Amino acid sequence: MMTSRLPSCFGLRFYAKRAATIRAKPSKLASSVGIGAKRSKKTVKKKGKEVDIFNYGKYVGLKERDPGSETKGKELLDKLSSFDQLKILPEVRNSIKNIIKDETLSKKAKESEDVIPSPIQLIAMKKLSRTLMDPKLQHHAIAAETGSGKTMAYLIPLFDYLKRQETEFPEDWEFMQDKAIIRSVIFLPTHELVDQVYNTVKKTENDLKFHVYKWDSGTKYPEIVEKLKNRIDILITTPAKLLNLFNIRMISRADRLLSEVKFVVLDEADTLLDKSWVEDTHRAIRSLPNTNHLLFCSATIPNDFNDTLERLFPNTIPITTPRLHKLPKSVDFKIIDSSINPFKGSKIKALAQTLYAIANDSSEPGFEKRCIVFTNEKKDVPYIVEKLKVTYGHDCIGLTSNDSVEERLEKIHDFITPPKPITMKKETPKIENEDSVEVEGSNITIGDFSSKTSVKNSNSESSLKVLVSTDLMARGLNFQGVRNLVLYDVPQTSIDLIHRVGRTARMQQRGRVFMITDKKTKSWAKALPKVIKKNMTLK
């Protein structure tokens, strides 16, 4: 295991001046992930046992976890296994179960009479329910591995809180139910995530009677003004959009609209509090002066994020799972070495053959396959897409920040919806002059590539759709049932690695990740299959 000797920076410069004069106490979240842990540390003791920690990447990106918090999480999960064991209003419990059953791709789960909550859903609701209706300001940070059901982990207490306001404080509810107010806000960093969370939350409109609204890039000012004439129970938007309320001339007192906001969620909080977002996010939070609950939610706890919580919200209480900062156990991780023959150092040839193998294997019978390809640089996306389409005949699209929100939503549609059944046998790309060669340590069979390799494909449609993008698509999006993922470039940090790999193998489903390496690839990247096998925590 390699250990980087580079410094574990970087703090937020935006707050450097304030930090120099005021030293806040370390938050409980900081202690839960091991503030002050040394870079060279590879194992920690837990009741006589050693817990492996793997130093991935050029920099130390993630805080080490306190083994004690992992033990507490496991002890709590040993006692809980059902929504019925949690303090949730019956109508909220039923609504949550219906949503989870509706959104799952598991046939067994859909047909089951009961719905089993995920670990983070159990732990979060158990801890939050103890003081849910306590009027004092409460800060909590929900942190769990990718694809673990974190969205529902914060929606359950939010729904329960709003319904308890109505039932436990009837006089207050009678006064506010017809007022032009906003009761809760969910902040997200991208409009794709705003749309995704909205599509989940709006399913409560019939049974829980919540008034749900999303304010995204396509919303016109007259529309939001008209909507704000009535009560909004849950507003889903970005911090910048909320701040725009104070710039709309048709709204005279934005502060009054926000005065009844009691529950605030920051989803993908490590992004919303990074140095490019933190000013807008902090201003948006300060515009909600009567907040009762402030929830931060993230799949990773980067050093910078933890430092920001220490400075701005030092009383934050952590809610974490034992698998935080670990790659999914259900992912099958393969290394594809582009430096060996027949690729001769060509990563694009290695990628094309990997996709060819995925398209032609026996996985996902009867359904259209989807694959996401991640690259480190935006400028590489058009090149990869052109090569895959023109030279190798793959059904491929590219997505970057240059695309409009509407274009991005259209491009990702086939990847965030369930896989489509195949009604006819489709021909997949066939590569001429194939001499089968097996790559050791992977399930890829390689053909004989030459610079003039052509593709035979008589059918314009393919049973494999490919999306090429950057980390723009690596955060929070629920790519439903996407079983294949290719890392065209090796992620440089453990943070990027966790979020990219987390687009597959979600909610205990199986997934495959193929990482293309070359002669420059470091040993810490090549060790990833063993990291997953040994259940190691990334740092």
Curated annotation (Swiss-Prot):
**Gene3D superfamilies from the UniProt entry:** P-loop containing nucleotide triphosphate hydrolases (3.40.50.300)
**What are its GO cellular component terms?**
mitochondrial matrix
GO BP terms: namely:
mitochondrial large ribosomal subunit assembly; RNA metabolic process
**Record's catalysed reaction(s):** ATP + H2O = ADP + phosphate + H(+)
**Localisation:** Mitochondrion
Q: Where is it chiefly localized?
A: mitochondrion
Q: Where are the transmembrane segments?
A: none
Placement of sequence motif DEAD box = 267-270
Key words of the record: ATP-binding, Helicase, Hydrolase, Mitochondrion, Nucleotide-binding, RNA-binding, Transit peptide
Q: Molecular function terms in GO for this entry?
A: ATP binding; ATP hydrolysis activity; mitochondrial ribosomal large subunit rRNA binding; RNA helicase activity
Entry's EC annotation: 3.6.4.13
Q: Any idea which positions bind ATP?
A: A144, E145, T146, G147, S148, G149, K150, T151
Sequence motif: Q motif, positions:
81-109
Task: Domain (Helicase ATP-binding): give its ranges.
Answer: 131-319
This protein's transit peptide sits at 1-24
Q: Domain Helicase C-terminal: where?
A: 350-539
Q: Which family is annotated?
A: Belongs to the DEAD box helicase family. MRH4 subfamily.
Q: Which PANTHER family match?
A: DEAD-BOX ATP-DEPENDENT RNA HELICASE 50
Tell what the record comments on domains.
The Q motif is unique to and characteristic of the DEAD box family of RNA helicases and controls ATP binding and hydrolysis.
Give a short account of what the protein does.
ATP-binding RNA helicase involved in mitochondrial RNA metabolism. Required for maintenance of mitochondrial DNA.
- The protein in question is named ATP-dependent RNA helicase MRH4, mitochondrial
Biological source species: Vanderwaltozyma polyspora (strain ATCC 22028 / DSM 70294 / BCRC 21397 / CBS 2163 / NBRC 10782 / NRRL Y-8283 / UCD 57-17)
Q: What is the lineage of its organism?
A: Eukaryota, Fungi, Dikarya, Ascomycota, Saccharomycotina
